[in-house]
Swiss-Prot record:
Domain of life: Archaea
Reactions the enzyme catalyzes: Co(I)-[methylamine-specific corrinoid protein] + methylamine + H(+) = methyl-Co(III)-[methylamine-specific corrinoid protein] + NH4(+)
Entry's Gene Ontology molecular function annotations: monomethylamine methyltransferase activity
SUPFAM superfamilies found in the cross-reference section: Monomethylamine methyltransferase MtmB
Family in the record: Belongs to the monomethylamine methyltransferase family.
Lineage: Archaea, Methanobacteriati, Methanobacteriota, Stenosarchaea group, Methanomicrobia
Pfam families the UniProt entry points to: MtmB
Keyword hit for Cell cycle: no
Pathway(s) this gene product operates in, as recorded in its UniProt entry: One-carbon metabolism; methanogenesis from methylamine
Protein name: Monomethylamine methyltransferase MtmB2
Keyword annotations from UniProtKB, A to Z: Methanogenesis, Methyltransferase, Pyrrolysine, Transferase
Amino acid sequence: MTFRKYFDCYDFYDRAKVGEKCTLDDWDLMKIPMKAMELKQKYGLDFKGEFIPTDKDMMEKLFKAGFEMLLECGIYCTDTHRIVKYTEDEIWDAINNVQKEFVLGTGRDAVNVRKRSVGDKAKPIVQGGPTGSPISEDVFMPVHMSYALEKEVDTIVNGVMTTVRGKAPIPKSPYEVLAAKTETRLIKNACAMAGRPGMGVOGPETSLSAQGNISADCAGGMTCTDSHEVSQLCELKIDLDAISVIAHYTANSDIIMDEQMPIFGGYAGGIEETTIVDVATHINAVLMSSASWHLDGPVHIRWGSTNTRETLMIAGWACATISEFTDILSGNQYYPCAGPCTEMCLLEASAQSITDTASGREILSGVASAKGVVTDKTTGMEARMMGEVARATAGVEISEVNVILDKLVALYEKNYASAPAGKTFQECYDVKTVTPTDEYMQVYDGARKKLEDLGLVF
């Protein structure tokens, strides 16, 4: 049976007003974990410790489980406390009509984002930047310039301005609007100073309200060739502010980057259960948000990292499955435990770059060092490693990738609780010349040597 019209954010808003009532606790503590557990058992999902899947039948079962999760659960609206349900036809229509490619940036700095596959020989797009990490106002430009100066980096992902004109960008205040506009203006100036004025950016990151996000589209700020962020909530939830942002993005013909970080050990539960939710979230991105691409980021509930053994498995299986059975374009964001200028930070980022590249990700986004929560602890050097490792991994046999990852993760996974704090950007770089210190170069070379010993060929 055909459907009356294509589903969009306006339909979502209308259904969020009349859908089935549900409490937040019932959603988080009953509906999500129970359905994920039920689907894991129904499809007999067992990843058997693999980072990147080699069992196509198991991948197909995972896709069916993720599809069913979205169909049967729907999406919870936190403002109306109602559930928005989709029909099976609406879900398939979104999957079958995704944006298959797009261009980020302009001129000679523009990059084409196209579908990759598991084991693809092409290097993914590297979106380098603080990835939502807090950055001091006085070094905001040089921090982002450190990424634009890296040739491995194709586009920039914004950091968060801790202040603007010395004031906190409080949500729904004039300072939030000013920060949302200033954030991208400063970054684009930094790119121009690095000789790459046409680089695309991804944001805004500072603003937390719809008015802030919408105001970032402005003269000298974000344009339709930049990635415009809207975030789903964990797990399979959204608020109406985000729906309003989507309405603006679609009406403005913006590239839409739908973001969400499924939590391993959280509401969904274990590895397979969280991956089911991750697949459902990917599909919801193109249905609810009309997303050009989905920015993933499975994160460990205890360690706050995306680079653990468990979260890498979730990321690898989710992306490989989405890549195998859909044309949805997918990225992943990086949150190591360790801080900059440490070998552990670089090895953590490398493990995720290997996983993402081999599993078919189109975009790698990072690195938010020190879990992305410490001011000024992120630099362009971590993105250089992310890019170099991606280049070295592209085209490597999946069986070999799984062996390398097992050995690599073992090098740092016992050190999460005592992860080295690392150094700030100001300690890692000459701020005036925006060049890394000799110390960081030596640390970088040491990490690179360990990766070569594991079998990567740079």
